[in-house]
UniProtKB/Swiss-Prot annotation:
Name of the featured protein: N-acetyl-gamma-glutamyl-phosphate reductase
One Gene Ontology term of the molecular function aspect: NADP+ binding
Pathway noted in the entry: Amino-acid biosynthesis; L-arginine biosynthesis; N(2)-acetyl-L-ornithine from L-glutamate: step 3/4
Localization per record: Cytoplasm
Gene that produces this protein: argC
Organism: Cereibacter sphaeroides (strain ATCC 17029 / ATH 2.4.9) (Rhodobacter sphaeroides)
Top-level taxonomy: Bacteria, Pseudomonadati, Pseudomonadota, Alphaproteobacteria, Rhodobacterales
Amino acid sequence: MVQNIAILGASGYTGAELVRLIATHPAMRIVALSGDRKAGMAMSEVFPFLRHLDLPRLQKIEEIDFSSVDLAFCALPHATSQAVIADLPRDLKVVDLSADFRLRDPAAYETWYGKPHAAPELQKEAVYGLTEFYRDEIRGARLVAGTGCNAATGQYAIRPLIEAGVIDLDDILIDLKAGVSGAGRSLKENLLHAELSEGTHAYSAGGRHRHLGEFDQEFSKIAGRPVQVRFTPHLTPMNRGILANVYVKGDPQAVHRALAERYLTETFLEVLPFGALPSTRDIRGSNYVHIGVIGDRVPGCAMVVAVLDNLCKGSSGQAIQNANLMLGLDEAEGLRLAPVFP
């Protein structure tokens, strides 16, 4: 049975990535696309690379008839999804790609996002969408909150190590490099080619990046006590991709073994042989995560390197993976795409 899909916020990067992936999904059909500022336009006018697809025109959200929609992806900007999802039919399954429902604690949301949550009841209902760790909850969920792309990368490298008890919880450092598409499609001076090309810079440094809220929430939940990591992201002049260097105290072989055993049966998570390190070029355009482990010159320390595509596994691909579970489909349906190389 083919499921009818609506994509709200289809004129942004994550919305376009949803369209690209769902176009070849055997059990999903796009029946509605929203883009309020571009309502009435064809998707091919906004994204010419989608010209060959037969897609509905962009509409305003209030113009969409949700009575025939089985699931909606909400790819709207942060702080916008709360009111929009609150107004959707209560029986409609929703996967939200924004930050609006990732944090379970209303106080934590206000701390990291600077304003009270406008839909606290939905915040309590939402299931955190890190698929490989919440798939049972996701199967029965009505609302799933997509993870932050940086938060997902770091968690794939660290969560099994906390679960296995093989690292010092008080000494975790994440040094992360991210592609520019993670900053969205709106015009910003610092994202102009002349400003960004041939350079890289740290941003939201000093413990200010909002994805730290997800690290705090998830790592503390696993450990059963507060866990805080040090995390600094860097913006790099590539379109797609995230590379996280994670520095931990723990036996390197034990670290590698914990990751390899935890992800042995996972479709999209691959742990490389000990000493091999991954590259963002090898997962570009795909839903795969590659993880490598190497020892450090300091005895008893290890470095874990994780890479993923921020638009795919870090956002839209993972959203479809979650939607597959919510709709009773094969979790990997429509997502077994080979990476784009070179």
